[in-house]
């Protein structure tokens, strides 16, 4: 099967980006072309395999992915971030599983959630942000009514169906990706740091009827070029996260729900998640963080009342 590899980047990943390029040209099933969508205003990196082609686009995690991909001539696209290492047979393996399961979208499980420390996993579950599921023979990742997600704690098969996943790497048809109109979700680029674009993209695929498959034990490594965790960035990420959760919950959880009873459950779930998050900040004496979270929720609610939001097509 033929495919095109497309990469979104700022051109600043350095050696991590070089490892991605090297692993792409070393694939047992190599791409027909490597297209790199780089943000306007950034320099083309020196790292190269001398076959990649650059296209300048508007900056943004969504803006650099929600494209028409007119340059792509193949049926399939392998979507990538710029800081991954790919085993030589991974693309061939992903295509094989796509055919085996009859899936529309295939994505590797990159983040080992079960390997987090117990205390972190406990707090994530208590907050409604992320929780483990046990003895689930069907699902990998699922979206929760708190706007968080749950994951399969003990996967034993090579792949499971999912409602969301990490967006650093996935394979699908170009037509299937275009069908979800990801450009409608550019509201996520409003913040300095985009949060949740992966969850929105995958869940929109799921709600559109596309069958998503999570592949386990792939050997893909997330080299994580974005390692800066300054106090300023931490505050910005917290703010963006709570703006995102407010909007995602309303757009993708609450509005599509037809049952009045379940809508009440939705309200209770997000209310619990926000109350827990705010209370934790108070208990820790982090009044600055409390204010950041509260202000972010207010901004999210303000956007829900905006004309721009009301004009977005509804998620069914």
Predicted feature descriptions by range:
Residues 56-72:
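Glycine-rich, basic loop-to-helix element that forms the pyrophosphate-binding segment
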Residues 126-162:
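Short, flexible, basic/aromatic active-site loop/helix in glycosyltransferases
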Residues 1-26:
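N-proximal low-complexity "stem/linker" segments adjacent to membrane-targeting elements
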Residues 165-169, 188-203:
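Acidic donor-binding loop at a coil-to-helix junction in glycosyltransferase catalytic cores
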Residues 77:
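Short aromatic/hydrophobic "clamp" motif used to bind/position activated sugar donors
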Residues 91-136:
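Conserved donor NDP-sugar-binding/catalytic core segment of glycosyltransferases
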Residues 211-285:
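Active-site-adjacent helix/loop segment of glycosyltransferases
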Residues 178, 193, 199-221:
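Catalytic donor-sugar/metal-binding loop of nucleotide-sugar-dependent glycosyltransferases
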């Amino acid at each position: 099967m033929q495919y095109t590899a497309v990469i979104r980047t700022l051109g600043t990943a350095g050696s991590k980006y070089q490892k991605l390029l090297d692993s792409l040209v070393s694939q047992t099933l190599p791409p027909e072309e490597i297209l790199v969508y780089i943000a306007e205003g950034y320099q083309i990196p020196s790292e190269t395999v001398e076959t990649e082609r650059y296209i300048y686009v508007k900056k943004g995690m969504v803006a650099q992915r929600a494209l028409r991909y007119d340059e792509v001539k193949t049926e399939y696209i392998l979507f990538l971030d710029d800081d991954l290492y790919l085993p030589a047979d991974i693309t061939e393996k992903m295509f094989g599983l796509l055919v085996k399961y009859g899936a529309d979208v295939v994505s590797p499980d990159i983040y080992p959630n079960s390997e987090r420390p117990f205390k972190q996993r406990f707090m994530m579950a208590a907050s409604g942000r992320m929780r483990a599921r046990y003895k689930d023979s069907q699902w990998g990742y699922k979206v929760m009514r708190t706007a968080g997600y749950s994951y399969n704690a003990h996967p034993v098969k090579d792949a499971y169906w999912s409602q969301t996943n990490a967006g650093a790497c996935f394979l699908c048809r170009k037509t299937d990706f275009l069908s979800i109109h990801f450009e409608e979700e550019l509201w996520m680029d409003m913040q300095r740091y985009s949060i949740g674009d992966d969850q929105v993209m995958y869940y929109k695929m799921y709600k559109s009827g596309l069958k998503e498959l999570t592949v386990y034990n792939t050997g893909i490594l997330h080299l994580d070029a974005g390692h800066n965790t300054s106090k300023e960035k931490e505050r910005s990420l917290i703010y963006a996260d709570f703006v995102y959760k407010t909007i995602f919950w309303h757009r993708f959880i609450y509005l599509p729900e037809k049952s009045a009873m379940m809508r009440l459950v939705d309200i209770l779930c997000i209310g619990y998640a926000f109350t827990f998050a705010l209370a934790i900040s108070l208990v820790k004496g982090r009044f600055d963080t409390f204010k950041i979270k509260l202000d972010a929720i207010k901004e999210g609610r303000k956007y829900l009342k905006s004309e721009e939001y009301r004009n977005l097509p509804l998620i069914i």
